[in-house]
Amino acid sequence: MPPIPPDPTESISIFHPKVILLSAGVTTSLFFGYKFYKRYIRRIKTYLDLTPTIIENNTKLYGYVTRVGDGDNFRFYHTPGGWIFGWGWLRKIPTTRKDLKDETLMIRLCGVDAPEGAHFGKPAQPFSKEALHWLREYVDGKYVTITPYSIDQYKRVVARAQIWKWTGKKDISAEMLKVGYAIVYEGKAEAEFGDNEDWYRKLESRAKLLRKGVWSLGKNLTTPGEFKRIHYRGE
């Protein structure tokens, strides 16, 4: 006699090979889906979202500069996936201060110090306006890539920042050193260079030799580090 066809409504054991294979497939898909989400889709909104793994692995983050606040820092809106994931044409970047609240990282350019602007009744340093204007022209309203190195005492993300120009990818800290609108960071703490300290110092030496920017002041130059020690710490 021919075998009796199995009842299609009969339950299948969880140990059935098909169930095991299906479960393994779903688990694998969820795992890699979550990894993909974390790396390419999840937005880093504030410094609190920066995990030790992101910093330790020198993870690059792509985003939009919403505001330049000083000669060596700016606000960064993370846009994971960039244009491919709809940023700028399908997914809009907020423009108002209200909508940007708790949605951006304050980026402190690594390895450099720009002249101090006027703050809290303190005078501005020579070339502080020029440095601020230069940085605004260079990055404000543009997309950049950052590599976070650390978070400083002011909750700023100390990072290498790079931007694409017609002549290729540019390191923003290096470009500021070239034109003399920043010097190599002097502080004993919070100095992050990645692997670029020697390069930065060579660029600074060349700008000094050519008397670019702040170096045109000669012996009258007070470095940003010295200025802060005098005016902000009462020395």
UniProtKB/Swiss-Prot annotation:
Pfam families in the record: SNase
Record field: transmembrane: 15-37
Annotated positions binding Ca(2+): D113
InterPro entries with a match to the protein in the record: SNase_OB-fold_sf (IPR035437), Staphylococal_nuclease_OB-fold (IPR016071)
Molecular-function GO term, any one: endonuclease activity
Keywords on record: Calcium, Endonuclease, Hydrolase, Membrane, Metal-binding, Mitochondrion, Nuclease, Transmembrane, Transmembrane helix
Domain TNase-like: 59-217
Catalytic residues, chain numbering: R108, E116, R156
Major location (coarse): mitochondrion
EC assignment: 3.1.-.-
Keyword Nucleotidyltransferase on entry: no
Subcellular location as annotated: Mitochondrion; Membrane
Entry GO CC: membrane; mitochondrion
Enzyme class, UniProt record, top EC level: hydrolase
Membrane topology, as annotated: Single-pass membrane protein
PROSITE patterns named in the record: TNASE_3
Family: Belongs to the LCL3 family.
Name of the protein this chain belongs to: Probable endonuclease LCL3
Originating species: Candida dubliniensis (strain CD36 / ATCC MYA-646 / CBS 7987 / NCPF 3949 / NRRL Y-17841)
